[in-house]
Amino acid sequence: MTNSKAKNTGESQVAKRFILSAFLAAAGTTQAVEFENDIIEGNFDSTLSYGGSFRVDDPELSSIGRANGGTAYSVNGDDANLNYDSGLFSHVSKGTHDLELAFKELQEVSIFIRGTYFIDFENNRGDSPLSGSAKREVGREAEFLDAYVSYDLPSSVPVNIRFGNQVLSWGESTFIQNGINVINPIDVKKFRVPGSELREALRPVPLLSASVQLTDNLSLEGFYQFKHEEMEIDPAGSYFSTKDFVGAGGQYAMLGFGSLSQPNMSSWTDNPLAPFLDGVPAKLPTISNPRFNPALPPSAANAPFLPSNAGAIPRGKSNRASDSGQFGFAAHYFAEGLNDTEFGFYFLNYHSRLPVISAVTGRDIISELKPTFDALNGGIGQLKAGIGQVDTGLEQIAGGIVQVDAGLAQVNGAIAQLESTDPNNAGLAALKTEQATLTGQKQAFVAQQTGLTTQRAGLAAQLAGTEAQLSTLTASQSSLAQLYPGTARYIFEYPEDIQLYGISFNTEIGATGISVQGEVSYRNDVPLQVDDIELLIAGLTPSNPVLGNLGALNPAWNGVSMTQLGSQGFNSYVQGYRNFDVIQPQFTVTKLFGPTIGAEQWVLVGEVGATAVPDLPSKDKLRFDGPGTVLSGNAFAPQILAANGHATDRFESADSFADDFSWGYRLAARIDYMDVYGGVNLSPAVAFAHDVDGNTPLPLGNFLQDRKTVTVGVTATYQNSWQGSIKYTEYLGNESHNFMHDRDFLSAMVQYSF
């Protein structure tokens, strides 16, 4: 490679790492512990940190569902606000260690291992409101990250091969995600930890990767991935979570547009369907604080607790992607004749790292229970017939006993008379024989009577139990339809075989100190989320056909559906996504200033990007999910809701849903003041993100129109080992759909590297 190439590539990458570390990781330069013996040499880097984060203000009522005391039309995104008032929400000790080994006798081979761990004393406490699975994600964790073997192949051209868990970064993106750099999914929750570093948040994946430097100007790369890894999203109810039904701990999606709170996992009730249907749990968590749910029968509408499946759709088993079929190739060309510009060309075949939501409709409970009704009624008839037969037998036996008693009375009288008047009468013996015979007959009748009486009692008990079962089912017939949601489920899916084609560049503009880099990615068959409310309503059409055809409410609406997905059948799969081609250009400009305004240097970085989905249908054909939509986009929604008791509910405007084009920009700056006092360096920094226009379809979610984020902070560094920082983040704009708008926070940390 030429010096100009090294300079060009190095400065652009340094600028990227510099800004990312300033605002995402706050990492300092470490001085590794080096060691060696006769066989190996290596170094061991360690970074230990301690910090906390504080919520500035209490949550607003508009961020809390109506059933939980707020004004929001959903309880599916308010757990974080219920769990965290103003004050401390994270209190963390953390460590990350890097081990690098090289073999003296085999210099081509090296090993790299990275591990990290943390404990959040605030979220790991015993009385934390988080679920057990959510607490395991944000309360404490220890894991290995990178762990790979590197081999430099002895050849006429440099060839490097790596095998194991590793991070492979392609493309030229800086801040805006979902570009070319998709090989490694992100562990979002790691970014939330005070003192977090980028190296901890990128999830290494098991790869066989290779790179070859064919000439000074041309290099090739390739990889094959052995195991699919997914993006780790915020656990349900954690501070940065905005959806309670996704992530670790997310188990239910609630109906009722905010009128019912989530199931109370500490209070359980018998499942009335369990004795009669296979595949349903014996116990169910309850729903507390029912505000208003006209779909429930009047007797249950004001109950302090309701069965969870009266208003909650449970989460089903995820449909995960295959571990095979993911690979990619890249070529890099350094064009000295084009202003020392480096170009990159990329192809990847990969599976989605981001989840999309689909549904399986509920079971036809009434039809499924019909054989049970028939069997119970048939059983009752048979039991009653059996009791009737037993009663007939008892009547016959009772008649026989009466006849035997009459005969005994005559015989006993005759015996008594002879014994008193003629004791030696020859007929007395015959009378006593007849007396014994009649006594035996009576005893037999009594035994039969006892047996039949016991049999009748058993039949009567069976009849009472069967009639009780029938009574339970009959009494619940009016509400069986309301138990339907609990037999449905929503599922996460990770569609396969997304193909990405990309091109990138990076260069400098003369001697201006300005670096420019950018990329354009074209992806084929990207799964985009259909509006989840459309999916929800479609899932309810089997039990409420009027949602599929509004003509039953108003003849003028005949043929009009409440959902763009149309009517569905019972126990059927409803795909919640559609595949589209997605184009994403993004460009970054970096300006490195020398000594000025008393500072050693300062850096300004700006990135602008856009997401385009050329074939996305118009919103009157099919609406796709955008951040923060919690109501239907159907213009009929208010009238339908009013007819079903939700007179005050409204609907989402078309502007709320995903657009075919969206764009925004990111700005960041940092100033370095060296040796301010006693060898301490100070670096004030500011970052600004602005989503200018359009809403990016989920699960991509790059831009939400008019959303803004501002972060200001200062970092102090001492002897490249000690570092402390404090920063403040404010969320602004589009408050009705930006669920972070009231979660401004302050964080501080101290870090030691050695």
Task: Please tell me what each predicted stretch does.
Residues 32-44, 57-59, 99-111, 150-161, ...:
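Short loop/turn motifs that connect adjacent beta-strands in outer-membrane beta-barrel proteins
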Residues 50-56, 117-121, 165-169, 226-230, ...:
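Transmembrane beta-strands of outer-membrane beta-barrel pores
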Residues 61-67, 128-133, 178-183, 228, ...:
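Flexible, surface-exposed loop regions and adjacent strand-edge segments
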Residues 106-256, 350, 664-666, 693-694, ...:
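Outer membrane beta-barrel
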Residues 44-46, 113, 161-163, 210, ...:
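Membrane-embedded beta-strand positions of outer-membrane beta-barrel proteins
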Residues 742-754:
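Outer-membrane beta-barrel "beta-signal"
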Residues 88-92, 348-350, 515, 523, ...:
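Detector for outer-membrane/organellar transmembrane beta-barrel domains
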